[in-house]
Each structure stands twice: as C-alpha cells, then as structure tokens.
Design a protein with these regions (language model features):
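Catalytic cores and adjacent flexible loops of soluble metabolic enzymes
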Residues: 1-116, 120-395
Length: 396
C-alpha cells in the first residue's frame, strides 16, 4: 500500500507574495479557481500574510471577498489556509482577545479551514488566544515553529578569554525546536509546521527535526521552506524521506526562486518513491496555463520588465532526458544515505536544467524571508533606487 503525502499549495498566497510582492488581483485569482476545484490539494494557502494588506493598500479590493470567493469556487475539496501572526493576526501590533475572537469566528464562517499561527520569536504566549478561538469555531489550529539559526559571533580572542569571555553557546538546538513544538501541542495544536521562511534549513537538519517531532508529538507535521538560498528542493526531499505528513509547494510558474519548491518536481520524486500525493496533476497543468500568463502580467506591473521563466514542464506528458531523470534518482539515493552535499548538488542541477533561479547568496548571507526580499526589490524599483540593494542586504 502506497504511503500518502499531503500537499498544501501556496501559490495564491505565499507563492505570489514571495515572487510578485503580493500584487495578484481578484480577477487573476478567479482565472485559476475552476481548475483548483479539480486539483484536489489537501490545503490551499490563500489568505493572511501580506495578502489582506496588499489587497487593500495596492489593489483597492476587499480581503474578505478574496477568501469568500475562493471558498465559493473550491468548496470543501481543499482546506483553505491563512497565515496569522499570533496576537497580531494579519497586522503589525497585538490585538485584545475580543478582537481575536471575532476575527477567528468571521474567518471560519467565511470559509477558512486552517489557521497557521506563528510568532516570529517563537513566543508561545502570543499564539495561545488564536489557537483557542480557531478551535472553538471549528477550525484547524496549525501551530508553526519558526526555524532560524544562531547569530554569527566571532570566537573570543586570547585576551577576551583571559577576561572571562566565553564562546557563544548555541541557542537554536534540536531540543529548543522540539520544546516549542511540545508547548504548542499542549495548547491544543492540531498540527505542527516546521516553518523555514528564509529557506535556511539544510536537508540533514530538517530530516533530524521531522524524525524528532514524529517520535515525540502525536499530531501531523508539515514542512514549509523557500528555495532562495538553494536548499529548498533538497530539504523537502529529505523531509519526505524522513516521514513528514505534509509539504508546502507552489505551482510551476510561481515556484522556486524566492518561493517554495514546485509541486511538479515533488510529484516526480514521490512517483519514484511510491508515494501518493492525491493531487490531480492534469488540473495543475491547467492552473499553470493561467499562471504563465499571469506571471507575465505581474512581471510588467510589479517590476516593469519581463523576467526569464522556467522551461515548461508537465510531468504527465513530458519525458525527462535520461541524464535529468538520473539526477532525480541520484538525489533520492543521496537523501536516503544522508549525503547532504550530494542531495543539494543533484537538486540544484535539476533546478538549473529547468531554468529556475540560481541560489541567491545575498539572501543566504542576510538570512531574510523570500517575501521580504521580493517586496524590497519592488519598493526599490518604485523609488528608482535599485542600486542600493546590495548595500541594504549587507546591512541586514
């Protein structure tokens, strides 16, 4: 019997936020919806994050209309997901409990199925109220443990050590992340997401965390990452092999680069591994037909230029060259053997073949989320100040 892997599609929220500064209009979303109903994703992230802000600020649209229109089109085929900043909800300052209560109630009544709840500093107190009210009104509370790495402190010199200064003690250990996940599970979380918004987690680390979470927490585990620094696809493969329950992906023309890995590449890996995602890839191909044109429209309206797009690829109808097919096998074998360098190398070669962006060393060093990077690029373009981007990234 084939193992099942659930797929959360991010295209209409994190996908467009990471690659196109969250400027996808309702009319553009509507063009994709008839095919999403047939795609059979476990979940679709469509709301929260920067979507409500951008919908009002830049598009002069109603964010509640966005959610309700998608729910009307998709029904209960896929659970609609939103990203909430804990007590801040979709804003940038904390709200009192009565506001959180009413917001969660209205969200679920408008069609929301899953609320992914996070605090950027992993402060569990800041997610408590949202978990409570989401569950109270019949929603699924998806609590996210935010992945990060320790600051890069220089090793103390000889005289500093003489004065008693010690080496930096690691904070963000496996035990730290597991403890946060356990605290969130104790609050009533229905699932836990390892949320790597900057794409910094390498394959070996995510495999370790997935196994640790699965062993110690009795609820499903989701993995969310980005491809910006060049780990995303390899890390998703490692998470799948380690036994993760859900992975987050984007459709082809909104995938990779600053976004999440492509469902099409994950589909190829899963097929080779004998894993069933339940996703209707014929419907995904129809979504991609729309997204290809929308991508061109957004490149012009957001960035004022046409950006290179990946080679078209439909895993149901296109035959991979033998050497590329062999790279998928090599990546799987390397991930199963815990050969991190070989896994990353094979996955990067796969991405390069399809014309996806090369790893962004600026983002890798600055350690910032892909959505923040794409928004910064768009804002500097608007200000005609693109030349300061490298310096800004250095300062970050």
């Amino acid at each position: 019997m084939a193992r099942n892997l659930k797929i959360r599609d991010l295209t209409l929220r994190d996908g467009q936020q990471s690659s196109f500064a969250t400027r996808m209009s309702q009319a553009q979303v509507d063009r994709c919806l008839p095919y999403y109903k047939d795609a059979n994703f476990y979940a679709m992230e469509v709301w929260g994050g920067a979507v409500p802000d951008s919908v009002m600020r830049y598009l002069n649209e109603n964010p509640w209309t966005r959610l309700e229109t998608i729910h009307k089109a998709v029904g209960n085929v896929s659970k609609l997901t939103a990203l909430s900043r804990g007590r801040n909800l979709f804003g940038y300052a904390p709200y009192p409990d009565d506001v959180i209560d009413g917001f969660c109630r209205n969200s679920i009544e408008s069609g929301l199925g899953i609320m992914r709840i996070f605090d950027a500093l992993n402060d569990v107190d800041n997610v408590k109220s949202t978990v409570k009210y989401v569950k109270q009104y019949g929603g699924i509370a998806d609590c996210a443990v935010c992945y990060t790495v320790d600051p890069k402190y220089p090793e103390p010199g000889f005289f500093a050590k003489l004065m008693g200064r010690k080496s930096h003690e690691q904070v963000f250990t496996d035990a730290y992340f597991l403890d946060k996940a356990k605290q969130m599970a104790a609050l009533g979380a229905d699932m836990i997401t390892i949320k790597d918004m900057s794409g910094l987690i390498p394959p070996r680390r995510v495999a370790t965390l997935v196994k640790l979470f699965k062993k110690n927490i009795d609820i499903p585990v989701d993995f969310h990452t980005h491809c910006t620094p060049g780990y995303g696809l390899a890390s998703v493969l490692a998470a799948i092999i380690a036994g993760v329950d859900v992975v987050d992906t984007n459709c082809w023309y909104f995938a990779e680069g600053t976004g999440a890995p492509a469902i099409e590449l994950v589909h190829v890996f899963c097929k080779k591994l004998g894993i069933d995602t339940g996703v209707n890839m014929e419907a995904v191909a129809k979504i991609n037909t729309q997204l290809r044109e929308i991508r061109k429209e957004l490149n012009q309206s957001v960035f004022g230029t046409e950006k290179p797009e990946p080679k078209p690829f439909n895993p149901l109808t296109d035959t991979l060259p033998a050497e590329i097919d062999a790279l998928f096998d090599k990546a799987i074998k390397a991930a199963q053997a815990d050969d991190e360098a070989a896994t990353i190398d094979a996955c990067r070669k796969i991405e390069a073949y399809f014309g996806f962006p090369a790893p962004n060393e600026l983002v890798q060093k600055a350690e910032i989320p892909g959505g923040m990077y794409s928004n910064m690029v768009a804002q500097l373009k608007q200000l005609k100040a693109e030349e300061i981007l490298p310096r800004a990234m250095e300062l970050i």
